[in-house]
Amino acid sequence: MDVSDKWLAEKSFFCDNDIMVLPKLTEIYFEEKKYSLTYYLADLYQNDFLSLLFYKMLSLSVLGKKKAAFKIYESHGDDWLNICKQYNIYWKHVILFALYFKQKRYSDWFQNLLNRHYDSELVQLFELIEEYSQEKFVQLPLFNKICEEYPSLKKFYMPLKSKNSPITFEKVLWRVWGKYNHKLRDMPLDKNKMQCLYNKDGLKIFSYKPHQVAASMHIIFDHDATIIFDCGAELVEDGIKHIPARQILEDLNINKVDAVFISHGHLDHYGSLNELPRSPCFMTEETASIIKMTSTNIFLRNLQVKNFYDTVNVGGIKIKFIPNGHIRGSVLFDIDWRGKRIIYTGDYCLADQHTCLGLDINSLLTIPKRTDIFLTESTYGKKPQMLSLKQYESIFVDICEAVIKFGKKIIIPSFAVGRAAEVALLLKESARRNGFIILIDGLAAQMTEYYQNSMEKNIIGGNISVYTGDIDLRYRIDNYNVIIASSGMLQEGSTSFFYLQEMLDMDKVCVLKVGFIREYEDMLISILNRRDKNVTFFDIPLSAHADYDTLISITEKISPETAIYIHGQGIEA
């Protein structure tokens, strides 16, 4: 493939917003083995081009997403080879598709394709499919050689192993939570949106179900003790909505809260702490520092700071702090509740980030006692096609480089806590290598300075600056290639809001959404109305949550008696 073809295709798409070149661009990226980027771009406009649906299916296959790939395959079944012919799909990719999906010799066109490229090892391997049983085929040296380049091919040929998994619909609330998504009244809610998730042997778990964004509060209690895990707030259209914790406790006939444990320093997990002023409040030192910096209206009374792996004893109930990889200072809680083991994950991530290490699952598996209740987040539980955080990070850097190459300014609305520093570090090496410069502004600038000092890590400097308050807004826009600004949700009056007010009328602007923004946010609506005109817009999820595959695999590894999916919309079974 000609290098000039790639340059022209990238310019047309990333600079001129011309989607007609996407079929060619995805072909080029797939051949360059940029499978995550291929999938991402193909997914954007799959309804406009059948060839993009083909590359979405093929990239999912190579990435090992077998079920998602087969779901697309079944949409056109035996017609895929005709689609390849109609859209002139690159021959090598046609053969690879035929290998993954075990195609037969349906047409003269396909047979001629095989004949023309018989010197290719892909073709030679395909020719052997009908000569060997599947058991012998996967033992061929040529098959294993091809699998070195395409490891996921083995998954498509190996029979599914039956496993005696303890995770069944009878033991797991998957089915309940799946239904809950579609019909709000499938599980009873009281007037304060509290939901009884568990009631057995005198132990009860109630969880708050928020209006839109998932604010967390989970009450675990028995006849002798009540402990609350997280007490967050919701960002709603007209501001912040606090959880009515005191009223909820009164409705549940709870007179005393023995302790409150906060998993991490995001508003949806601590924003209603003022509702519980008398209870001892436990969190890590890093979480306490983050809350003090970002929320001056939160009063941390009765604060007790703990370190990773510390254990707190509350009336005979033991709660252990285990780092969980979401942001700096974040933890899950491993609870021994009078002989019952409960794990409350908070928000968690297995992948290492620049600013914190991922959850070490072995820290949970080495404890011999079986988990009775696994209370886990499910932010991405309804997105089985979702890629991993590392794959989205790769997509993010690739798109930034492509956009900047053609002279566009990039604005990245970002959460101040953790995400801004993480985004800056993702781009740091690329900025040095490609010569573009980055400005961090708003509360994100203060938090990035805090992260730099607390981590002793070089974030600021070189090609990355933080705004110090003495430079005109227009000057900042004109003299920086990338601007990272809070708030991540584009709230009116925020730093990111003011930047976009100025930038949306410019000719070459790219908005990169890397976290949650409410659909009704006026600025987001303005951005989307200009999309594919003067504004380029990409939505690349970089929040450090457990992806769908992780949610399933972690549950299977922990093998609890009961798994409850919270803080999201359940999980797609």
Locations of regions flagged by a protein language model:
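Structural motif corresponding to the intra-repeat A-B loop/turn of tetratricopeptide repeats
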Residues: E32, L63, F101-Q103, Q134
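Metallo-beta-lactamase
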Residues: L184-N199, E286-S330, W337, N453-N479
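Pre-active-site segment of Zn-dependent metallo-hydrolases
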Residues: P210-A215, I219-I262, G271-N274, M283-R301, ...
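Catalytic core of the metallo-beta-lactamase
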Residues: V213-H218, D222, D310-K369
